[in-house]
Amino acid sequence: MKTYRRQLREKIIQALYTLELRDVDTDSAANWLLTKEIMDDPNAMKFFNHLMQSIVRNREEIDRYIAKHTFNWDMSRIAIIDKNILRMALAEILYCEDIPPKVSINEAIEIAKKFSSTDKSSKFVNGILDAIFNDMKAEGRIKKCGRGLVDHSEQKMQKTENNR
């Protein structure tokens, strides 16, 4: 069974797609897509609204990261779905402190497999997100707490190497 957050992420991708194609506001796009069950769940709405607003408010910054890592691609040439999957994952990495970056990247890859028009989209999304994540980590841009702390396995590997 899909995780509840996966369903919310999929709804966010659909809402972003709607915003790209129609002259509607964020609330209208969300209202068309969200089920009563989701709208009645305060935790679901908190996650949905926080992530959606993070994408909308920080779109220019997020798009700069994408443009920097898509050397041979003009932003207008990237498929709308792929672009929005990248935006969502980057917003999650940057603005959802309790979600591990690897989870955000893996969720984006799975959503790309489901929604994108080609089999190559998930590989494209994976490559771009991995490169951006590595740069963000090097720049100290990743701020995580609790469950969202940056990959404990990397810390364990480093300790193991230091003990040799």
Curated annotation (Swiss-Prot):
For the keyword Ion transport, the answer is: no
Quote one Gene Ontology molecular function term.
Answer: RNA binding
Q: Which GO terms describe its cellular component?
A: cytosol
Q: Which CDD domains match?
A: Terminator_NusB
Which Pfam families would you find in this protein's record?
NusB (PF01029)
One of the GO biological process terms: transcription antitermination
Which UniProt keywords are listed? RNA-binding, Transcription, Transcription antitermination, Transcription regulation
User: What is the top-level taxon of the source organism?
Assistant: Bacteria
Q: Where is the signal peptide?
A: none
User: Has UniProt tagged this entry with the keyword Transcription?
Assistant: yes
Similarity annotation = Belongs to the NusB family.
General function of this protein = Involved in transcription antitermination. Required for transcription of ribosomal RNA (rRNA) genes. Binds specifically to the boxA antiterminator sequence of the ribosomal RNA (rrn) operons.
Spell out the HAMAP family in the cross-references. NusB
What is the official name of this protein in its record? Transcription antitermination protein NusB
Give the species this sequence originates from.
Answer: Chlorobaculum tepidum (strain ATCC 49652 / DSM 12025 / NBRC 103806 / TLS) (Chlorobium tepidum)
